[in-house]
Structures are given as C-alpha cells and as structure tokens.
Amino acid sequence: MRPRVFQESCLALARLVPSFLLASCVLLLIDNFTYTVFGFGIRKTDGTIRYFYAFLYLALLGFSYRYIWIIERQKAKGRVLRLSGAALPALSVLFVIFRFLSLAGGSIAQTAETAPLKNSPNIIIISTDGLNADHLPMYGYYRNTTPFLQEFSKTALLFENAFTNAGNSGSSIASMMTGKLPTATRLIYPPDILRGKDAYQHLPAILRRLGYRSIDISIRHFVDPFDLNMRNSYDRANFREIREDKLIEYMAKYFGQDTAYFIDNTLERIESRLLHAYGISSMSDAYEEAVGDGQKKYHNDDERIEELLAFIDASTAPFFAHVHLMGTHGPKFSPKQRKYSSGQAQSVNWMVDFYDDAILDFNRYMKKIVENMRGNAVLDNTIIVIHTDHGRLWKTLLRVPLIIRFPKGRYAGRFEQNAQYLDIAPTLLDYLGIEKPDWMCGQSLLSSQISPHRRIITIRMKSKVAEVIDGLWQINQAKVKPPFFHLGFVGVIICHRWYELDLTKKVLRYSEIKGHTSPCKEGDSPDPEEIERFIVDHLKINQWDVSSLKLPLDKIYIKPAR
C-alpha cells in the first residue's frame, strides 16, 4: 500500500512540471494576442490590476494539471497511453533537474581560458547613441559641446574620417564586435540574431579566453549581447549576472541554434510576465526603453555609469567593458543641464539645441569615468575607445566620431585616412599582440598599409519598417519580405565619396561626404556603374538573392549639403 501511495505522490508532483509549461505557454499566447490586437496586456498593468493575470495563471495551472491528470487516467486504454502517461512527468522532472544543473555550470562551447597576457591593459569601449562627428568641436563644430573630450582627445588617436557599418544600434555594435559585415551575419534589425559560428566568433569571446573579466552595459532587446545571441561573451550584462545554460547549448548543438534561441527566449518571456503579474519586478518595454520617458523609467545613463564604476572598482584581473549610453538618442532629448536649450520648449522632434545639451551630458559622463580611473591609478593601463553606433537620424553616410586613447597616450595624433568600425576589434588585438582571426574583415588602424581607396560597406534597414502605430511600437511585416527582408540600403564609401543602392526602388544615389578632411584626387573614385556591380557582387557572395537587381540601375547624383 505504502509504495503505491509514494508512487502516486511522486506522480502528483511530477505533473506540476508539464502543467507549469502548458499554463505558461497558454498565458504567453493570450498576452501576445491581447497586446497585438487590442493594445493591452500584462506589461500595461500595474497595481492591483496586475493580479488579475496572477489569478488567471493559477486558473490555467489548475486546468492544465487536471488535463494532464485526465490523460494519465486514460492510460489503461492502451500501452502507448500508459507509457506516455508515465513518461511525460518523468521527462519533465529530468528537464528541470538538468536545467538547474546546467545553470550551475559553464558553457559546453566555451574554449578553455588561457592565462592573461603579461601586463594586459584594460579595455573600455564606450558609445553614445546617434552622435554626429560634426557636432563635436574637435571635428570642427562651432559650439564647445565636449570641453573635456576636446582636451582628452589630445592624448588620443582621433580619426577624422570614421564611418559606421550599419544604421541601427544592434547591427552596428554586432558588426564592430564580430568584425563581420551585417550583410554576412544577416543581423540587420530585431528579431535578427547571430547564428552558427557568428554567435561565437567575436572580440568579447577572444578577450574572455585571455582572462578578461567582462561586462556589457547597454540596452535590452536592441544591443544586449544575449538578445543578439552573442554566446560566451560577457560575465555580466545589463544589470544581471550571465551564466551560459548547458541545456540551451546542447539544444543548439543537436537541434540548431534557432530552436535553442527560441526556447531560451520563450522561457525568459514567461519569466518576465510571471514576475510582473505577481508584483515581484516590473516588465520592461523595448520601445519605451529606447525613447521618451522610458529612459527615465528603466536603467538610465546615470545608472549605467554607476554600474561601470562599480565594476572597475571591483576588478582585480584585467577587465573589458562595453558601454552604450542613450542620452543622445532622439527624437526627444532630456539633458540634465540646459546650456543651449535654456528657456526653450521641446515642441518638435530633433531640436538641435537640446541635442547639443545631450552631448554636453555625455561629455560630463566621460569626465567622471576618466577622473575615477585616474584616481584608481588604472587610466594609464587602459585602452579607451569612444564612438557612436550611427549618426543622428540613423544616418550612415557621414562622419562619426572615433577616438582611441591608448595607455600613457601612446599613438596620440590625428588619423586622416578613412576608418570604419570593423577596424576597432583588429586594432585592439594588434595592440595586444594577437593575430587577427581570418573571419574579421577590418584592418588594424595601427597599420601603415591602409589604402585611402579601400571600399567601406555600410547598410541601413528599409524605411519605416519599425513604426509606432496607435501608441504601440510595431514591425511592419508587409515590408519585411524576400529577397532582402529588413535590408533596405547598401552603401559604399571610397575616399570622400559615398554611393548607396536603394534595394527597394532599385536606384543608386551618390555624392560627396560633408566635411571630409582628406579627399582623393579627381578621377581616383570609381564611376557609379562599377560600384553598382560591386554591391551586387557583394550581396551575391553573401548568398542574397539578387535576381531582382537588373543592371544597369537608375542613378541619381545628390548635390552635397553645405
């Protein structure tokens, strides 16, 4: 009798696991449906209203438990049902046990770490969103928007003509870290992620194997390394400790990364909804985190800087930090001190005076970081990279800031030849004395072999793919279709000229880069026909379907702005 009671008790407990999974998935489906169709869901609730979903979940859990119990009661009808009735709870229990054990361990894909390099310098890569070089005094701007950085840059290597490789934060940061073009990784815009080898081939993984402690302080959903599926990358990311999940890694190995990422992402979404419904923590909103009042509600730049300083203070081993600030992200700005916008109301989007005040905020943050490092005596053993993700209004065919301060001011000066963000990782590895992997496309900017005529590729997503409709941030699925999906524009920069192919309208536009300080001689730039063939060949090499691009295409010369 007792063995049977014990068996029934074990089965009763085992039923809770599949019941939890079933109830959670149903809750997720309901929430996604109501939010998409009617504009309300768990995230929109607060106070006592959120407990409606808590009670709903309990009801779903009870229904699921009874449903599984009914299935199990029917096992007498056949051997298959008998086996499935026993196997489902057993497998569920094993799933939970294995998941907890996997969280306690490391990643199966992680290469064994080596000893740190002798006298390894610390590395900080810090960016602020949507920053134009032509709004900085060291690039010729008439306002002194960055008084501290202007002096600081005199001890650094400043790149006068630097360019991003992508017009959106995620694709820009991912290409910088991987050293691969977005056209190769297919990471253009969410929900695009790194896949296959791309998920493991990047600068953070290399530094981690060299013994670096690492942290990413950016923004969830858009730049977060694990939202981008950048595996084996950081020890801590966006205010949470990161432990690679062995179960997810095994699933990626045997069932494919798309399946593993989907399951991992689904479990995280379920967790965030349940924590919100039961009042444990608030659920974030991807759109609100990036714009408007959401920057105040969620982790703001003050919190990001404090997180960085705490990480630096606690570090004993060499550290690597990537920080992405959001104060200069439009279309509206919330500067802490208003010098240029004093007395004005921010009545329209993208007001220049408010933008310049936001840049002043970034300057103050940089001063705080550098002074803290100087006080901790780590400044002269740290490489500091200052850049942005793209230009204001997500532009790519203009100069963006790039300043690299090496330990003790080594290599200080101004670099006139064209640079791209794909060059950042190879440059850092070169300084460390590490050979650049074959999969990195950029060049070390410490090399004297950079041709002024090399072709820099940059991309932008299709226009109006992401829009705010009826107060909700949505992807216009009608525009995300084959053969180019999110990809809308492919640009090429050579010397002081830019060319950009509009993949939707099948038009090639070209012009000169405003403010370029090292133009090539007349006749050194290729003609538009050569560039359109180059772009089409580049897409073809990277397995894009280019059958819709019938050459020659229409061409439009754009008169440069003055």
Features from the language model and the residues they span:
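Formylglycine-dependent
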Residues: 221, 227-312
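Short beta-strand segments
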Residues: 127, 163, 216-218, 319-327, ...
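Metal-dependent active-site segment of extracytoplasmic phospho-/sulfohydrolases and closely related
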Residues: 148, 357-398, 402-403, 408-409, ...
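His/Cys-centered metal/cofactor-coordination and adjacent catalytic loops
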Residues: 118-121, 132-245, 251-252
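Membrane-interface soluble catalytic domains
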Residues: 1-40, 63-70, 85-115, 205, ...
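Alpha-helical transmembrane segments of polytopic membrane proteins
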Residues: 1, 45-60
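Active-site His/acidic residue clusters
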Residues: 278-290, 306-357, 393-400, 405
